[in-house]
């Protein structure tokens, strides 16, 4: 077997290294950049978008795709700032903008916290596109191209079909009229804002409601890109293969987290639940990881198309470094292997392990919970788990396991390095939760597991046997006495 054959064998296909891989094979037939959820508000907020465009230009892209949420507030000014950034980089070139709308482009001016931020910066809903002639008129004025709920642009002979937000219901009729021209071995690219339900990792929440997957299932040569999820590209479930291929694009502006984590997304008050035990937990003791600027990941893709493969490079566009090994989709899709079939990936994805000699350190301490109330917590500290190069730990699970076989308390946590490249992962992890949830009047041990994105766990770190005394239910808040 030659080196070339080895690199593209089924076993090695997911370990290829971005642009270094592409260098092995020369120039592709087509190259395009992808960023999503850029959430432009003010001229300054377009800085990272412009930096990404400049990087894409250095890479010689033929087009740049943005699957929705170009703006945060849905104002005409946001589209103007997007177009100005584009023109500073690509004016006078043949590079094609492949943009579509997201929920923020239509409705962002009406979201509570966004409205407050908008007003604080001197903008208002008076400039909303939906109050100034509607989306089609504002789109055409800003970008100089006709707006349709479904449309097709062609770049170097490859078709790009977009479905607009509030326009997915039009795709069925559009494909009935035009779908025959998309069939065949040659890939075409579809993009929309919301996840295609039943495909990538976060497509079972706020998605397209199942409208699109049955339609695209007739096209094995379709490679779809979606936005909205704001999931960083460390989640290997962000690429999916079934009847077609679907790819979840990370956000250029800020990361979001999966639910069910003590320090993850949810109300800052901590009134969140039910937890992984199916119960409504007390107010969370651990503060949520910061959002927005503190979770800037600035991630996106460079997509390279050859006649026998599509290579999707994963880039940190703030660091301008390749953030993870490229995903490689073999072609033609109708007969090629499917390395990103979830059943295949779940078996192939490495399982984390803790360093040799790793120990779990436990202590109780007092702190404040998310509501600012004094709380006693169990503090758990241990070395970060490790994975083979190119893979990442997804999260950590801490269990309080009674020795009598009764149900364990289960808590999950996300590493502070979750939204970043591997080099930002801390050497040690530190998580905590309310001691009121621990078993009482029975022996138990604390177990810590590292998990990959498919939920497969490492061997645990295990504490010594502990036993709490009963009586927590007798603890009552102090009553304020009249002075």
Predicted regions and their residues:
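N-terminal export signals
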Residues: 5-22
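Active-site glycine-centered loops adjacent to acidic/histidine catalytic or metal-binding residues
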Residues: 37, 68-69, 102-103, 193, ...
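Short acidic, glycine-rich surface-loop motifs adjacent to enzyme active sites
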Residues: 182-201
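A short C-terminal boundary segment appended to hydrolase-like catalytic domains
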Residues: 274-413, 461, 466-482
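N-terminal active-site segment of His-dependent metallophosphoesterases
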Residues: 19-80
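Beta-strand-rich modules
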Residues: 438-455
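Recognizes extended acidic, P/S/T-rich segments that occur
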Residues: 9, 397-439
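Extended active-site neighborhood of metal-dependent phosphoesterases/phosphodiesterases
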Residues: 76-187, 211, 215-221, 234, ...
